Amino acid sequence: MNIRYYNTYEDDFFESKNQNYKLKDNYKWIKNNIFYKIVAFIVYIPFLIYGFIYTKLVLKVTFKNKKVLKKYKNYFLYANHTLEMGDAFNPIVGLFPNKPYIIVSPSNLGIPVIGRLLPMLGALPIPDGIHQMKKFIECINIRSKTNPIIIYPEAHVWPYSTFIRDFKETSFEFPVINNVPSFTMTTTYQKGKKKPKITIYFDGPFFPDDLDTKKQKIKNLRDKVYNSMVKNSKNSTYDYIIYKKN
């Protein structure tokens, strides 16, 4: 039995080789250069093909309740963070033909070779400092008008975790101020021959209740999303790794 011990939900069980990678001061989240867009399109095609192969043939993921997404092109999708590579590919395959943008840690851009390509594939790195936050928020607001935005509110990868960690309200301001729906994507695990079977459940749409203040709406939406993920996480029937608090 594989047991891992943690102190808080902020603990990391997976770190990239360049965990302290910093964005350049002049980093641009939206690049309008036509040549950049052409290269990004060319790079995205083999990435998408590999994603389908990895998700369907290696991880053997089953998607449930995709019908809830059918009517929508732009929305925020909140997911539990439990697979190192799978969390990069599963949303792209699950949401196809829509191209999602995924909010990621800047450390991902420090990965040799592939790190430089990630922004072309839809990665939106979180800025390190306040001075870059305005442009980051502008990018999220623009992208959310036309595409799905994927957010992992738990922030840290806990491989094969079968419970939903408590998370902050911060990222729920985006769907509230942009008045777009939110959905959940909950990865669950069942016993397999060698590694767990993976079943992913979609749920939604979720909107905040008609409350007096933006702060109340943000909390209300966060609670709806959290409760949905907790509900669907109950479909996990096998603990490949057990997490215990110190």
Feature annotation, model-predicted:
Residues 1-78, 86-90, 115, 120, ...:
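Membrane-anchoring hydrophobic helices of lipid-metabolizing enzymes
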Residues 60-220:
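Soluble catalytic domains of membrane acyltransferases
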Residues 226:
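A conserved mid-domain beta-alpha-beta active-site/ligand-binding segment of alpha/beta enzyme cores
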